[in-house]
Amino acid sequence: MAVQQNKVSKSRRNNRRAHDSLVAANPNECTNCGELKRPHHICAACGHYDDKEVVALTEEIDLEDDAA
């Protein structure tokens, strides 16, 4: 296990950690459907990326009809 040579003060420790925070990415608007999506990702609403359909989305299945 590593052992420190000298004590690291709270100020020096916190200054080192100042740049460790995570920043949320700004969502972009889908050019096909207008929904918000993550940058450089396929739109979850319509399955398009770069104005091309990449994923064909299936229709939702109604479970209420099957349960009866």
From Swiss-Prot:
The keyword Transferase does not apply. Keywords: Ribonucleoprotein, Ribosomal protein. Disulfide bonds: none annotated. Residues 1-21 are annotated as: Disordered. One of its GO terms (biological process) is translation. One of its GO terms (molecular function) is structural constituent of ribosome. GO terms for cellular component: large ribosomal subunit. InterPro entries: Ribosomal_bL32 (IPR002677), Ribosomal_bL32_bact (IPR044957), Ribosomal_zn-bd (IPR011332). It holds the Pfam family Ribosomal_L32p. Belongs to the bacterial ribosomal protein bL32 family. This is Large ribosomal subunit protein bL32. It comes from Roseobacter denitrificans (strain ATCC 33942 / OCh 114). The gene is rpmF.
